[in-house]
Amino acid sequence: MPKICQITKKKSMLGQNRSHAMNATKKKFSLNIQYHTFWLPEKKKKIRIRITKKGIRMINKFGISKIYKKYII
């Protein structure tokens, strides 16, 4: 399964490590993805989401019901 946040739709990105001599090596910047379980009161069930830490903060700010309706996970 690809590392994509189900809320923010962010993916890993590619870049470069640079040494002091400015030699470049390829690097993959990965996301802080975690599985998280939320309780949906209107559906009366738990949902398990693969989500980044930023997505968890969005849910804490706006509420799981509003995010669920907007993004329909």
UniProtKB/Swiss-Prot annotation:
Which GO terms fall under biological process for this protein? translation
Indicate whether Lipid biosynthesis appears among the record's keywords.
no
SUPFAM superfamilies per record: L28p-like (SSF143800)
- The transmembrane segments are none
MF terms in GO: structural constituent of ribosome
- Keyword entries, A-Z: Ribonucleoprotein, Ribosomal protein
Quote the protein name from its UniProt record.
Large ribosomal subunit protein bL28
